[in-house]
């Protein structure tokens, strides 16, 4: 073998026999030596000349060495002599060439460079020798071939990671030698070699060596791409040898990076091979990474490469499947998204691969939160290209709330490339539709098949010189109406083969559907409403027939379309009537008779208009109904989208809005129709984020569903009574003048619009509405868990309410405590006056509920009228205050109270007792505090029944003024009093912190606690007598008829008052009984008594046995005299009459010091009987207190 000699001594260049005294072997000079090898000896004087000569030689040879080596290697002509079998002479010439290269290297002046050249020369020489060997095409290579070539390739790969080595290897022609070895290796042994392991290893090492040698070396890349047969060999290896595809894909990746036009053209055949390799190796993550990286670079070279990637079977599907937000596959996803960024540019301008676009968009939206900036940038670029001309993809992104939110987040990114890409996507999503009428037919797959079916007038509509397309502005389309109408020319391909007749024209992208005027050679369709009567349907059919005669040329086509439309309308009408009849039958069997409505209630009150509680759906709800839910609008808003009034062109803008409003008188739905539609389609309208399932109906048969169009719809608001009803119960229709108004297209929720926008209360619907309103009012009022929501005062009976008969049980004793009176179940004919009063009372309830700290009118009982005091917002009371109320309640319950109640319940009164009772009531009615109310006196049985039905909790509601506390709330049963008999607190005061600051406690008729028979005869509860409730604590003697309420006077007392200090001397004279638990007592806030004399009080002075206490108030002379006279008379009566029953002690008076007491305006007394009381003069800082 010719290469054996060079293998034995690679450093040997030639032999010389002329030298004497030598071995004849020329050794290389020592590295770094500046002397030439010569037998001539120089003198010392010649040293300077030699150094100068060497300097000139170094400058000359610095440039000549690389060029000389290149010229020597170019003489080999590997590409041209590839098929020529070398001879021995050729082997000798190659050996001489290597010696000349070595001689040139030794002449290199740069020591480091010379060293690197000498290091790379042996491996390059070995590769060239193997080229000569492979030219001979040996059938079976010797063992030395594999070992020598494998060792040389390992050395090259190891050293090729250094940049300087790559430079000298390029000078020594190592790139061309490796390319020629690869070509000859594949050509000689083939892909399916006999010894695949060895040859695959050699080819793998060649690919790795070339990948490293071409890194950053543009000259090496150009030479390798232009090398004859190399790219074809690489393509063959990639396709036929998948085991080493990865390394050759890496080689192509390096060659395709920053490639010029010549390199791109040379690498174009590798695109198809790499696409196939990616499809086959997509399950192997490491194998497909380099392949996708090469395709990423190649996809940006030319449109042809993009088309090749898209046309490769399953290539786009593989790319879509590889899109994953998993961080482990970041490098893989970066390459996949990079390919899609370039490929999407090709897809944006073509109509191919439409079925994969939605999949690609969906998968790429999940990558917006990726941690890789490269992945995010590539994804945004691909999305921007895919949606720029496809409104379907734009709508899909708009409906993805998470994707839209992430896009808005990426707008604030710190990277310019990401912000630029996001800006492109958002601009496309936010701009209106820029496509024209016929563009959608191509983008959805119509193609040439749809265009071939167009007639001459139809083709005119598609051309750009048409008036509509020449002047129409995309700004006329709203932002929401992103999906244009597909038009009548788009049909499924199977349907086009069966039915060759064109369909009825549908609506366009700009005009409302009811606009049926011919414009520029085409006619717009009208909206279809299933509730049209027969006359309107015939009229619509006639208009359709006229349109068909204009649009279609032949009479047969028009008749066929006319027949189809009539069949469709008749079928819809029959279905509608059948469902209506079934619903009416069910309504007649199950529904109760609806009471007739009152004419006075036809006008909605401000309360109803403000709350809108009469409908389950509100105009402001997020689920605003649709045409299918009986909203009586003049337009089919679910099908119109929001482009209701857009003109065809600027020239066709109508002079008046009424020219675009050809609508019909739509019949209003009856109650049965409403029940039928609402029961079946209560929840059929979706939100705007999803597709509405209300089907679009046009005058013609719609071949393409329109349910993805997001259109504004409105909810129904009591559709049974939307419009004003006539006395006979029918719903009048609007006139044509009213419907011609453009404001009727989309009625808004204005309070000043016609009454048809709001519901009317009447009949059974009113009761439901009242209950809803009541619950809404009560829910807004602050409540307490321990107290009832409202306390009712019986003295308000009859105020602002109609006169009714007294019933034994409350009309609103339902657990819900609804203040609205409920109609009796046995009443069949409702009273119109009562309904009217109920409406007024409902209005008053609503008004008063919004007024804080004011009396609320509420129908408490059926025959009376009372006030409701709203529970003020307050902080919780302390334990001492709650204890005060319990003690006050305990102190007032005596056995005499039980006996009095039992007498009032179980036995009839004597005439004397009744007369005594009536006089007491008259005196109360005549007083100013009682409002002059007159209530009918019920019998004892009625009072007992009412007493048994009233039951409330035991604790008092301290948040309410005591004069509004109804005694019906308290339980006076015998069992209740037994719980407190042992806890009686004689020291209990009548004061409570819960009393309103503007109320005065008038306790002139407080019981002394004795069980006398006189008390049993004259005492009864305010529940039995309908007497006024007083401002005394719960459980006290407030049930006595003689208790009066003082007039309210404004005061500035806001803070809690301390416990009044008593006179010690008087306390010693009148010791109080000691009880187990003694608590501090708090006085009420200071108030003023009204300066007015009550002449009626003289008539009841002899009927009472209680002492009057006036607290914290200056009194006039007449009032003070009356107080002392009453005290003396009562003291005299007590001394004359013996104690009855259990012998209660005689009440005595004591003087205690009040907190804010003022000096009385008088100084003396007129009654001579008060001489024994002279020693007790009124002290300005004292008050009169009766000790029981």
UniProtKB/Swiss-Prot annotation:
Region Required for interaction with pry-1: what ranges? Answer: 600-1188
User: Do you know which InterPro entries this protein is assigned to?
Assistant: Apc_fam, ARM-like, ARM-type_fold
UniProt entry keywords in alphabetical sequence: Cell cycle, Cell division, Cell junction, Cytoplasm, Developmental protein, Nucleus, Protein transport, Transport, Wnt signaling pathway
GO CC aspect terms: adherens junction; beta-catenin destruction complex; catenin complex; cell cortex; cytoplasm; nucleus
Compartments where located: Cell junction, Adherens junction; Cytoplasm; Nucleus
* The ARM repeat ranges on this chain: 314-358
**Domain of life assignment:** Eukaryota
Annotated tissue distribution: During the L1 stage, expressed in vulval precursor cells (P3-8.p), seam cells and excretory cells.
Annotated region Disordered: where?
A: 1-50, 579-624, 670-702, 726-751, 778-952, 1003-1092, 1157-1181
Residues of the region (Required for interaction with bar-1 and hmp-2) are 1-486
Recorded GO molecular functions are:
beta-catenin binding; gamma-catenin binding; microtubule binding
Bias kind Polar residues: ranges:
604-624, 677-701, 778-788, 800-811, 909-929, 937-946, 1014-1039, 1164-1180
Instruction: Name the GO terms of the biological process aspect.
Output: asymmetric cell division; canonical Wnt signaling pathway; cell fate specification; cell migration; embryo development ending in birth or egg hatching; embryonic digestive tract morphogenesis; embryonic morphogenesis; endoderm development
Q: Which family does it belong to?
A: Belongs to the adenomatous polyposis coli (APC) family.
Share what the entry says about its subunit structure, partners included.
Answer: Interacts (via N-terminus) with bar-1 and hmp-2; the interaction with hmp-2 is relatively weak. Interacts (via C-terminus) with pry-1 (via N-terminus). Probably associates with bar-1, gsk-3, pry-1 in a complex.
Can you say what this protein is called?
A: Adenomatous polyposis coli protein-related protein 1
UniProt gene name: apr-1
């Amino acid at each position: 073998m010719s290469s054996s000699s060079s293998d034995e001594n690679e450093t040997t260049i030639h032999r010389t026999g002329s030298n004497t005294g030598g071995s004849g072997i020329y050794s290389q000079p020592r590295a770094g030596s500046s002397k030439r090898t010569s037998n001539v000896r120089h003198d010392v004087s010649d040293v300077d000349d030699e150094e100068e000569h060497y300097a000139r030689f170094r400058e000359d040879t610095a440039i000549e060495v690389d060029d000389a080596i290149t010229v020597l290697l170019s003489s080999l002509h590997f590409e041209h002599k590839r098929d020529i079998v070398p001879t021995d002479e050729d082997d000798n010439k190659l050996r001489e060439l290597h010696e000349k290269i070595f001689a040139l290297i030794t002449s290199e002046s740069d020591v480091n460079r010379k060293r690197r050249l000498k290091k790379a020369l042996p491996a390059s020489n070995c590769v060239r020798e193997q080229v000569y060997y492979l030219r001979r095409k040996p059938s079976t290579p010797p063992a030395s071939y594999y070992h020598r070539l494998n060792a040389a390739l390992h050395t090259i790969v190891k050293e090729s990671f250094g940049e300087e080595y790559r430079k000298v290897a390029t000078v020594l022609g190592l790139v061309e030698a490796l390319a020629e070895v690869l070509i000859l290796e594949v050509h000689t042994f083939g892909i399916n070699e006999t010894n695949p392991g060895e040859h695959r290893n050699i080819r793998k090492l060649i690919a790795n060596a070339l990948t490293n040698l071409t890194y950053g070396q543009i000259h090496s890349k150009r030479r390798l791409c232009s090398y004859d047969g190399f790219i074809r060999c690489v393509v063959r290896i990639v396709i036929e040898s998948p085991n080493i595809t990865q390394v050759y894909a890496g080689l192509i990746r390096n060659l395709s990076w920053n490639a010029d036009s010549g390199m791109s053209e040379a690498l174009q055949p590798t695109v198809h091979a790499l696409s196939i390799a990616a499809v086959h190796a997509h399950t192997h993550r490491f194998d497909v990474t380099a392949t996708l990286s090469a395709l990423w670079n190649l996809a940006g070279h030319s449109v042809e490469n993009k088309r090749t990637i898209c046309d490769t079977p399953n290539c786009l599907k593989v790319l879509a499947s590889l899109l994953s937000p998993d961080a482990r596959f970041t490098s893989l996803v970066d390459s996949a998204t990079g390919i899609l960024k370039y490929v999407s540019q090709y897809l944006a301008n073509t109509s191919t691969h439409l079925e994969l676009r939605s999949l690609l968009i969906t998968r790429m939206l999940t990558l917006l939160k990726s941690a890789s900036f490269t992945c995010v940038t590539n994804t945004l670029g691909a999305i921007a290209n895919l949606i720029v001309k496809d409104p379907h993809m734009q709508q899909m992104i708009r409906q993805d709330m998470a994707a839209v939110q992430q896009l808005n987040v990426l707008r604030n990114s710190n990277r310019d490339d990401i912000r630029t890409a996001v800006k492109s996507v958002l601009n496309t999503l936010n701009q209106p539709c820029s496509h024209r009428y016929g563009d959608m037919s191509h983008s959805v797959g119509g193609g040439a098949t749809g265009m071939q079916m167009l007639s001459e007038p139809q083709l005119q509509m598609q051309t750009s010189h048409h008036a509509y397309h020449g002047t129409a502005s995309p700004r006329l389309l709203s932002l929401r109406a992103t999906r244009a109408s597909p038009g009548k020319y788009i049909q499924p391909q199977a349907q086009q083969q069966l039915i060759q007749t064109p369909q009825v024209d549908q609506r366009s992208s700009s005009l409302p559907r009811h606009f049926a005027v011919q414009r520029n050679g085409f006619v717009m369709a009208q909206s279809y409403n299933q509730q049209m009567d027969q006359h309107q349907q015939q009229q619509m059919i006639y208009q359709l027939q006229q349109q068909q005669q204009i649009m279609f040329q032949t009479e047969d086509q028009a008749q066929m379309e006319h027949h189809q439309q009539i069949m469709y309308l008749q079928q819809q009408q029959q279905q509608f009537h059948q469902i209506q009849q079934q619903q009416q039958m069910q309504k007649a069997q199950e529904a109760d008779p609806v009471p007739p409505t009152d004419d006075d209630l036809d006008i909605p009150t401000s309360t109803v208009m403000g709350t809108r509680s009469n409908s389950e759906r509100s105009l402001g709800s997020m689920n605003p109904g649709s045409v299918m839910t009986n909203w009586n609008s003049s337009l089919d808003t679910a099908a119109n989208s929001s482009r209701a009034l857009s003109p065809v062109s600027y020239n066709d803008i109508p002079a008046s809005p009424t020219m675009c409003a050809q609508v019909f008188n739509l019949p209003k739905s009856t109650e049965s129709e409403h029940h039928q539609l609402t029961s079946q389609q209560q929840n059929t309208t979706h939100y705007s984020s999803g597709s509405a399932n209300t089907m679009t109906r046009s005058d013609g048969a719609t071949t393409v569903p329109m349910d993805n169009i997001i259109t504004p719809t409105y909810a129904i608001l009591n559709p049974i009574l939307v419009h004003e009803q006539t006395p006979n119960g029918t719903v009048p229709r609007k006139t044509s003048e009213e419907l011609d108004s453009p404001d009727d297209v989309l009625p808004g929720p204005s309070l000043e619009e016609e009454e048809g926008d709001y519901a009317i209360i009447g009949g059974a619907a009113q009761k439901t509405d009242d209950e809803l309103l009541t619950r809404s009012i009560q829910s807004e009022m602050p409540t307490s868990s321990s107290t009832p929501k409202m306390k009712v005062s019986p003295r308000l009976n009859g105020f602002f309410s109609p006169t009714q008969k007294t019933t034994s049980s409350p009309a609103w004793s339902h657990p819900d405590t609804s203040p609205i009176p409920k109609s009796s179940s046995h009443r069949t004919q409702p009273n119109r006056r009562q309904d009217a009063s109920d409406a007024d009372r409902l209005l008053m309830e609503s008004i008063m509920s919004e007024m804080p700290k004011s009396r609320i009118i509420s129908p408490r009982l059926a025959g009376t009228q009372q006030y409701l005091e709203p529970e003020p917002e307050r902080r919780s009371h302390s334990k001492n205050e709650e204890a005060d109320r319990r003690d006050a309640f305990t102190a007032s319950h005596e056995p005499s109270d039980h006996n009095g109640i039992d007498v009032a319940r179980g036995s009839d009164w004597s005439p004397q007792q009744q007369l005594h009772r009536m006089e007491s009531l008259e005196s109360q009615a005549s007083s100013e505090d009682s409002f002059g109310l007159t209530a009918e006196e019920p019998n004892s049985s009625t009072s007992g029944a009412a007493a048994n039905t009233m039951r409330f909790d035991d604790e008092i509601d301290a948040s309410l003024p005591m004069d509004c506390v109804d005694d019906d709330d308290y339980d006076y049963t015998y069992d209740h009093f037994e719980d407190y008999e042992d806890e009686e607190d004689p020291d209990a005061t009548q004061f409570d912190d819960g009393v309103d600051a503007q109320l005065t406690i008038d306790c002139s008729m407080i019981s002394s606690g004795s069980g006398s028979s006189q008390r049993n005869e004259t005492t009864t509860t305010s529940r039995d007598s309908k007497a006024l409730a007083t401002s005394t604590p719960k459980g006290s003697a407030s049930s006595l008829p003689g208790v009066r309420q003082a007039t309210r006077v404004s005061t500035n007392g806001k803070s809690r008052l301390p416990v009044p200090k008593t006179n010690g001397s008087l306390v010693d004279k009148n010791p109080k009984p000691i009880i187990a638990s003694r608590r501090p007592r708090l006085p009420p806030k200071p108030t003023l008594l009204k300066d007015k004399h009550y002449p009626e009080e003289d008539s009841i002075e002899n009927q009472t046995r209680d002492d009057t206490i006036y607290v914290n108030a200056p009194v006039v002379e007449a009032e003070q005299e009356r107080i002392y006279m009453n005290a003396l008379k009562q003291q005299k009566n007590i001394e004359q009459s013996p104690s009855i029953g259990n012998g209660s002690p005689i009440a005595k008076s004591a003087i205690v010091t009040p907190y804010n007491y003022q000096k009385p305006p008088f100084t003396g007394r007129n009654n001579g009987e008060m001489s024994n009381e002279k020693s007790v003069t009124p002290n300005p800082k004292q008050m009169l207190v009766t000790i029981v």
